[in-house]
Amino acid sequence: MGEIIQFDVLGLPAPQGSKSAFVVAGRAVIVDGSSKTGRDKHALWRSQVSDAANAARGKTQFAGPVGVSVVFYLPLPASDPHRTLHATRPDADKALRSVLDSLTTSGLVRDDSQVYEVKATKLYARDGHWTGASIQVWDASEDELRYRAESKAASRAKR
């Protein structure tokens, strides 16, 4: 495994809302499905992630394939303080999309299409743990080289 950048983001994880498309007077219109409050929370969260990534990355910018692991820590509901696994909203994929876009905004990765491996986990922030996310991004160039070598070896073995 190549270089690893790891950082924590304190705040309230906010998902990236879905967009809706429809036609008005023959023209396509795309709108954000989130409320203004949702958009404000999302903008704040993305800013917090981008700022934390900038502080952690120094001058690093990953140019090749990367792996990303995110553990989201969400508020513990008063109705069930014994839960650990967070199996309610926000959706993990939408929360993850927000983080990946922020990694691009920060310059840590050039484009979120570079992410070839991803893991997202949602947990409740228990026992005084802060809300936010622990994020790890790693250079996967060595994985690329290993897969190519394994592929060549498998091709030779078939001959």
Language model features with spans:
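Acidic, proline/glycine-enriched N-terminal capping motif
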Residues: 1-159
